[in-house]
């Protein structure tokens, strides 16, 4: 009995030393509950990411495992080195950009696309090392940041509607409505509304519940074949190490590489600031403890992710669900990471999820990201016009890169044209000029 008590006490002492629970006004029990809560809100990524990367021709079973592995790696590293209640996983939006644009639309092999992700992550790591990253966040205006986030939201939403069959290609009108009497379309729509209704009622596992319900209904209708629940993890060798560094290191992909880097920069940094602020860890300027360590973990996770065969890794805003139930330290993130490791043994379940079950999650994430347009000052046309152009050009040009490029250029045009040169930071001018050079010397040839 005394031995058991001693072991328990030493375990608690170790947790206290590593995570400083008392200092943060929390307990191990609270942190574990917070970890479970965050995990339930973001575990949908292990079902959705393989579906999306599968479009690029990647082995979905292997991607399921690598998604779990990189989510575990990033989350555990964030917990141990930055002691923050923030979990990481492959980014929604950038996975769609990789699969639908870089591979499908541009016709590049997925190995080259992974190379572009790698170089973008290396760029992000260098910006972090030389402390340029926070300078860029501080000097790029809210309207452009919001335009980028919202544009990716519209792009993801469009992909979700397409995957559900709600919209289909039409040579005369570009797109038109699909067959709304088809059971797969109806299940895709149902999946989205299940998420939206449950999320509005503050049910953290809304996306997971939707995927389970629509998959079960698909099974009842004969679309889904039961393959068991637990099995040994499938081989990952079809995707691990298949990154084409030489093929992706060329000027023609400069815009794509820059897009991966810039979007990840805003996405992760914005999430880290938002979650730490909600946890009461950030100051009035948005700075939080161990910020440098957090940014390093984020960058290194993306580099690692590209090598093992998954898209750009980012901090997840779903981490705020764990914070809302008391998560304050890295123990929350470590719990999330350990749970992702356990999920690896549930690969047969991931193989059963039909495309329309994942489509609802895509549309919902699109809604969440597009809602940030509310932060734009619509009364100031020098801010609202670039935000609008950035957002709408992503789905309409079918390219996140073009949306970012036209957003930065239009921001400079509006500020110069109205004589408000003081609003232009060197950062915005440099990025706009780089995109102009890309359009003139690369895209034109």
From Swiss-Prot:
Residues 1-28, 82-83, 133-144, 200-203, 280-292, 327-330, 377-381, 418-445 are cytoplasmic. This is Adenine permease AdeP. Changing residue 38 to H: Lack of activity. The keyword Transmembrane applies. It is found in: Cell inner membrane. Its main location: membrane. Belongs to the nucleobase:cation symporter-2 (NCS2) (TC 2.A.40) family. Azg-like subfamily. InterPro entries: Azg-like, Azg-like_bact_archaea, NCS2. The gene is adeP. Changing residue 271 to A/S: Almost no change in activity. Keywords: Cell inner membrane, Cell membrane, Membrane, Transmembrane, Transmembrane helix, Transport. It holds the Pfam family Xan_ur_permease. Residues 382-417 dip into the membrane without crossing it. It comes from Escherichia coli (strain K12). The chain crosses the membrane at residues 29-52, 63-81, 84-100, 113-132, 145-165, 182-199, 204-222, 251-279, 293-308, 311-326, 331-345, 357-376. The keyword Endoplasmic reticulum does not apply. GO terms for cellular component: plasma membrane. One of its GO terms (molecular function) is adenine transmembrane transporter activity. Changing residue 317 to E: Strong decrease in activity. Changing residue 317 to A: Almost no change in activity. High-affinity transporter for adenine. It is a multi-pass membrane protein. Changing residue 318 to D: Strong decrease in activity.
